[in-house]
Amino acid sequence: MVERKNTFRYILRLFLSLIAQAIIFFAAAGQFEIPRAWIFFILTFIYYLTSFIILYRLTPELINQRGGSAFQESSKTWDKYILIVYTFLGIYAQFFVAGWDLGHINFWPLGLEYFGLGLGLFIISIVLIVWAMVQNPFFEPTVRIQKERNQK
């Protein structure tokens, strides 16, 4: 059975991370009137919500595992460092750079055709990520053999 504490922690992590990303982006941009950014954050909210529902119904034990600590005892040390760097650069710093560029520099203004392409690729990536999580009940942030869950 899924531990409620870890389930709540998983949901909280997802949505607090999204809120932090939005705050970083809009603070760096210096403005809130950016329709494409709002579309992205709303779609990401919908993605987080629907993926949680799908995972909770199909692989509740995965929610329990992902709601716990990202750093398990058996996690590889090198992978812990990769996760820290990825979290900083991939989850937070990119929103600062994108917001700063859009609000102050506008170095690379992209047309609507790029928005459609980006949206399509974003949706494809969502489907692939959720599919991988459903197919692999051992899907965790770091590399480790989960002996406690009989992974071989």
Language-model-detected regions and their locations in the chain:
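Membrane-anchoring alpha-helices and their flanking helix-loop junctions
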Residues: 1-152
